[in-house]
């Protein structure tokens, strides 16, 4: 069982856990859900991850990591835009990194979606509002 942050963020409440307890009580198996969510990936999405990781850069002090996914990368790997969702977590998992940023080209226009994640010391919601 999980929520979007795997129960690790401050907005995870006791209500969240009560809902999960109810799901377990009706027969949902946590191991099976975990496997389906975290241990299942398509080859296309895995190839996209490899492409994206090759774009990663760090600030000199190693506290900020950023990477990007282009429309060409999506086309080359035949991955879906949904396949980009967990990529930012690889940047955030690097030791010393406090802020991770993912730039994603979306759709047929020239828009770029920017996602921020932090380990908690920095309120990235303020950055996202800029």
PLM regions with names:
Residues 1:
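Catalytic-core segments of class I nucleotidyltransferases/pyrophosphorylases
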Residues 4-130:
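Hydrophobic helix-and-loop "lid/oligomerization" segment in the mid-to-C-terminal part
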């Amino acid at each position: 069982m999980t929520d979007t942050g795997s129960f690790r963020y401050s907005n995870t409440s006791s209500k969240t856990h009560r809902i999960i307890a109810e799901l377990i009580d009706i027969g949902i198996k946590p191991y099976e859900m975990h496997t389906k969510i975290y241990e299942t990936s398509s080859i296309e999405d895995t190839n996209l991850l490899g492409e994206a990781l090759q774009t990663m850069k760090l600030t000199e002090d190693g506290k900020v990591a950023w990477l990007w996914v282009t429309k060409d990368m999506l086309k080359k790997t035949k991955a879906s835009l949904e396949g980009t969702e967990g990529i930012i977590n690889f940047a955030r998992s690097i030791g010393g990194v406090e802020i991770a940023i993912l730039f994603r080209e979306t759709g047929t226009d020239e828009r770029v979606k920017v996602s921020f994640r932090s380990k908690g010391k920095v309120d990235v919601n303020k950055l996202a509002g800029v």
